[in-house]
A protein has these predicted regions:
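A residue-level marker of the well-folded mature domains of exported/periplasmic proteins
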Residues: 1-215
Length: 215
């Protein structure tokens, strides 16, 4: 949907500089670039997880500067609502925001904590519960996708294919070769980023014309 050489953004990340946010910016860009090699991305840090006013203002500015696609790492539907008013498409974050912007949302990531809580409570009941880090995946339904909307059938089919590939482990966005935007090789040809790499990712991939804050 994004036009050649148009901006695809903005990113509207959260309160602290986190690998989670950097990783999602990179994923968004790699996905967009896979279907449009000329895509550009602009990044705006609003320094909050939830502030509808700031989120809407950032989206407004970016759209005025030429963004034709909006994505976010904040939690309110304000960016999508702003996009809808401007006739721009975008993606929701953390929950299905379709009811707030039915003409703008293409899909949204959905955080579904139920499987995690059920397994942990069951572990307490069984006496098998242990502390530790947890990394949930789409095949556990901890991360879900909202229905694909406002897109033609062929695009919907392509999106479903990618979603299925992620769930069954056949598609992984961070598969080398991948360089960062300084030209340093981060993943060799065919190498798949492991959890350690993903959770220490503090670089933008090649093609993103921006600096990670503080670097």
């Amino acid at each position: 949907f994004t036009k050649s050489k148009a901006r695809a953004g903005p990113r509207l990340p959260g309160a602290r500089l986190k690998t989670e946010v950097i990783r999602e910016i990179n994923t968004y860009y790699l996905g967009a670039k896979s279907v449009n090699p000329d895509v550009d991305i602009d990044i705006v840090w609003v320094n909050t997880w939830y502030d509808p006013g700031k989120e809407a203002q950032a989206a407004d500015v970016m759209i005025a500067e030429g963004c034709d696609m909006v994505a976010q790492h904040t939690d309110s539907p304000a960016p999508l609502q702003t996009a809808e008013k401007a006739g721009v498409l975008g993606f929701g974050q953390a929950s299905d925001q379709y009811k707030f912007a039915p003409k703008a949302q293409l899909t949204a990531t959905i955080d579904n904590w139920s499987p995690y809580y059920i397994s942990k409570v069951q572990g307490v009941i069984d006496g098998t519960w242990k502390t530790g880090d947890y990394f949930g995946h789409m095949n556990e339904d901890v991360v879900q996708m909202a229905p694909f909307t406002n897109m033609p059938a062929n695009v919907k089919a392509f999106a479903q294919k990618i979603k299925d590939g992620i769930k069954n482990g056949k598609y992984f966005a961070f598969t080398g070769p991948i360089k960062d935007n300084t030209g340093k090789l981060q993943l060799k040809d065919g190498e798949i980023a492991d959890d350690g790499h993903l959770n220490s990712m503090m670089y933008y991939v090649e093609g993103i014309d921006a600096k990670v804050p503080g670097q």
